[in-house]
Regions:
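A generic structural signal for residues embedded in beta-strands
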Residues: 31, 116-118, 221, 300-302
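Long, hydrophobic/aromatic-enriched structural stretches that serve as scaffold segments
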Residues: 82-83, 102, 107-117
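Extended hydrophobic/aromatic segments used for targeting, binding, or gating
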Residues: 282, 288-300, 312-314
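Hot-dog-fold acyl-thioester-processing enzymes
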Residues: 2-99, 153, 163-181, 186-283, ...
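Short, low-complexity cationic-aromatic patches
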Residues: 67, 73-74, 105-110, 257-258, ...
Length: 348
C-alpha cells in the first residue's frame, strides 16, 4: 500500500511511495502542499550555493529591471521547490535520468505561492538483468502555477523506480517519443518577461553583455565546489525521495545527491563565467550521466551556443554546461562527467 491516511483501527499501514507496477497512464498527483517562497527559503538556498545571479540579490536593480517591488526568486529555487513538491510518485526513485522541455513561463517573486500537478504520461519496464533489482522508467509531466492560477513552470522528468514484485511483467514499453527533445526558439522567446528593462540592466552592470558574446566560446570554471548540505536541501524543498536522506534506500549504499543540487551548483558556476546573465528562461534538456555524492568536488565547463537577438535589445543565448566530479576529499582523484545541462539564458 502506498499510503494510509484513513487507516482502520488496529490496522498496520506502511507509508511510502508507489512501486513501478502501481502506476498507470494518466494518473495525476496533485496533493502536495503549496509552498510560499519566503526570504528564509531564499537565504538557506543562497547559503548552500553562493549563487551570484544579480536580480535575486540586488533589490534596487531588480526593481529597475522588473518594475516591481518584490525580489525575484532565483529560477533554481523555483525549480527545486517544484521538483520537491512533485516527488510523491518517485519516493522510491533509484535515480532520475533526465529533465526535458523545462520552461519558466513567467517570473516568480518572493511572496508567490507555488502549486504543482504531475501526470504519468509514459511507462517502460526495463529488461531484467541478473543480480540487479527489477526497475522501470516513468515519464512525468509536471506543471506548476502561482497563487493566481497563472502557469509558471512546465517540464518532463524521468525517474527510474523499482518494482515491488520482481516477477511482475507489466507490459509497459512506451518509447517516450512525445517528450520533446528540443525547444523551439519562438517557444522560449514567448517566456521572456514582458516589460523588463534590459537597458537598465546594461547601464547598471559593467562587463560583457549579449552583444559581446561569441558563439563557440568555452569557459572553464577552475574554482570547484564541494557538495555539502545535500539532505538539508532535499528537506528544505520537500523532496521525499528516500535515496537522498537514507543510504539504505540508495542503489549505491550511500546517500545519492538530489539532481537539482548538482544543477544548482552548475548554475552558480555558470554565473561565474557569465556574471551578467539576467536569468535562466528554459532548459532544453538535462541529463544525469553519473551519480553525485556528498563531498564530491564539482567543476563546470560552459559553452556559448547560438545567439538570438530580441527586438528590444539583448537576447537569448543557448548554453551548455558540463559538470565533472572528483570523488570525495581526494581532490586529485580521476574525474567523472556527471551532468550535461543545455539551457537558454537571457542577457541584456
Amino acid at each position: 500500500m502506498e499510503h494510509g491516511c484513513m487507516a482502520e483501527l488496529g490496522r498496520r499501514v506502511r507509508i511510502g511511495g508507489p512501486y513501478f507496477e502501481d502506476l498507470a497512464h494518466g494518473r495525476v498527483f496533485a496533493d502536495a502542499p503549496s509552498v510560499t517562497l519566503t526570504d528564509g527559503l531564499a537565504a538557506v538556498s543562497q547559503a548552500i550555493f553562493g549563487d551570484r545571479l544579480r536580480l535575486p540579490l540586488d533589490a534596487t536593480l531588480c526593481a529597475a529591471v522588473t518594475g516591481g517591488a518584490a525580489a525575484l526568486a532565483h529560477p533554481m529555487l523555483v525549480c527545486n521547490v517544484v521538483i520537491g513538491q512533485r516527488t510523491g510518485p518517485s519516493q522510491r526513485v533509484r535515480g532520475n535520468l533526465f529533465y526535458r522541455g523545462l520552461v519558466l513561463l513567467r517570473p516568480v517573486f518572493i511572496g508567490d505561492t507555488l502549486r504543482t500537478r504531475t501526470e504519468v504520461v509514459g511507462l517502460k519496464q526495463n529488461a531484467v538483468r541478473e543480480g540487479r533489482p527489477a526497475t522501470g522508467l516513468v515519464a512525468l509531466r509536471v506543471r506548476a502555477a502561482n497563487q493566481h492560477g497563472e502557469p509558471v513552470l512546465d517540464f518532463w522528468r524521468c525517474p527510474m523506480l523499482p518494482l515491488g514484485d520482481a516477477g511482475v511483467r507489466t507490459g509497459h514499453a512506451d518509447g517516450f517519443e512525445d517528450i520533446p527533445a528540443e525547444l523551439e526558439p519562438g517557444q522560449v522567446a514567448a517566456a521572456v518577461p514582458e516589460g523588463w528593462r534590459l537597458d537598465a540592466f546594461r547601464d547598471a552592470c559593467p562587463g560583457e553583455h549579449f552583444a559581446d558574446l561569441v558563439d563557440g566560446t568555452l569557459y572553464e570554471v577552475e574554482s570547484r565546489d564541494t557538495v555539502t548540505c545535500a539532505p538539508e536541501l532535499a528537506r528544505l524543498t520537500l523532496n521525499m525521495a528516500q535515496t537522498h536522506t537514507d543510504a539504505a534506500a540508495s542503489a549505491f549504499g550511500r546517500r545519492l545527491v538530489y539532481g537539482g543540487h548538482t544543477i544548482s551548483v552548475a548554475a552558480a558556476q555558470l554565473v561565474r563565467a557569465l556574471p551578467n546573465l539576467v536569468t535562466i528562461v528554459a532548459w532544453r534538456g538535462c541529463d544525469h550521466l553519473a551519480p553525485v555524492f556528498e563531498e564530491d568536488l564539482l567543476r563546470s565547463e560552459v559553452e556559448v551556443g547560438s545567439l538570438h537577438p530580441l527586438d528590444g535589445g539583448g537576447g537569448l543565448v543557448e548554453l551548455r554546461v558540463v559538470v565533472h566530479a572528483a570523488r570525495g576529499v581526494t581532490a586529485d582523484a580521476e574525474e567523472a562527467r556527471v551532468l550535461d545541462w543545455r539551457l537558454w539564458g537571457l542577457m541584456a
